[in-house]
Amino acid sequence: GYDTAVNVCVEAVRSIRATSRSHDRPHVVQVMGRNCGDIAMKTAIATGAEMLVVPEMEWDVDEVAARLNHLIEQGNTRATLVISEHCWDNMKPFDWRKFLNDNGKTVYPGEPISAEYLASILKRKCGGAEVRSTVIGYTQRGAQPTAQGGTAVCQPVRCWNQAPASSSASSPPTAAVS
């Protein structure tokens, strides 16, 4: 599953980066991974993304905005920020709802922060840059397994079948049905 998820994310980010280049727009791309940023990190490395935010590390919205602003000032108006879901858990305190509400974007009480809201924050902190967002989400989960992914799934079965016959575990376990 991991290899398949990474490959789907890499292809998606490459397509997004091609579009971002043609329209000169920075992009926030959120990938799945729950509390682990490995898929996001591997995707960012493979695609040359300029920034990465993962749940394992504390991060600051103002630092991300400053980095994006610097890239834009240097002529990179199409930077890509790859984020992992649950990265919000380690975001330094920032009243994002108040910031957006005070700056022309309505956010209702109880709404969780999202890639879309992060893009809106960055747009407002980076001089109106047209920052877009995409959540790859279930697309990465529903893809056909890669060759490596398929091999990884079959490996435990091969190991089981190669267990010594004298072992008490000579046949695969069966699920109890009640």
Question: Which residues does each predicted region cover?
Answer:
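Accessory alpha-helical/coil subdomains and C-terminal extensions
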Residues: 2-21, 26, 30-129
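C-terminal non-catalytic interaction/assembly regions of soluble proteins
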Residues: 110-178
